[in-house]
Amino acid sequence: MNVLIDNRQTKVDASGLEALVVRAIKATLEEEEVVDEVEVSVSFVDNEEIRKLNKYYRGIDSSTDVLSFPLMEFEEIEEGEEDEKDAEEIYPIGDIVISLEKAKEQAEEYGHSFEREVAYLTVHSMLHLLGYDHETEEERKLMREKEEKVMERLGLRR
């Protein structure tokens, strides 16, 4: 597993978050039984930058907590024949963009730690990169169950 982290904001102290994000990504991959070597890029931004990204990519002119940018359908990795796979190959599965400013606001609003919020947003986004969504009630319920399992694995239950 290769995790690239880029802190592109200065409004919120990001000390210690890199290790937490790596743990959250690893726990999600383990829970989903992903055995392939994957690469994930994570960017920490402020509300203004995520608002611009949200407007550009989704047509929504407001800040949000996290955006997920899958680079491929995860099934593409799983479906390759074993003899065609390079054992050393690392599959870039996507990018995660987290507004630390929004995460801090939400942690205060929900009454839990900033670290728990960042871990949750990372897990949520990882599930999107792995092909999950929450467009329907059924999808939302499944995704929520998976999020809770990973958060429990991390010792960060509600």
Curated annotation (Swiss-Prot):
| Cofactor: binding comment | Binds 1 zinc ion.
Which GO molecular-function terms appear in the entry? metalloendopeptidase activity; RNA endonuclease activity; zinc ion binding
Annotated GO CC locations: cytoplasm
Please name every pair of cysteines joined by a disulfide bond in this record: none
- Co-factor(s): Zn(2+)
Query: Biological process GO terms, please?
Result: rRNA processing
The EC number(s) attached to this protein equal 3.1.-.-
* Keyword Zinc assigned: yes
- Enzyme class (EC, first level): hydrolase
Cytoplasm as a keyword of this entry, yes or no, is yes
Q: Where in the cell is it found?
A: Cytoplasm
| PROSITE patterns for the chain | UPF0054
The UniProt entry's coiled-coil ranges are none
| Binding-site list for Zn(2+) | H124, H128, H134
What keywords does the record list, in alphabetical order?
Cytoplasm, Endonuclease, Hydrolase, Metal-binding, Nuclease, Ribosome biogenesis, rRNA processing, Zinc
Spell out the PANTHER family in the cross-references. ENDORIBONUCLEASE YBEY, CHLOROPLASTIC
Entry similarity comment: Belongs to the endoribonuclease YbeY family.
What does the function comment of this entry state? Single strand-specific metallo-endoribonuclease involved in late-stage 70S ribosome quality control and in maturation of the 3' terminus of the 16S rRNA.
The protein in question is named: Endoribonuclease YbeY
Q: State the organism named in the record.
A: Caldanaerobacter subterraneus subsp. tengcongensis (strain DSM 15242 / JCM 11007 / NBRC 100824 / MB4) (Thermoanaerobacter tengcongensis)
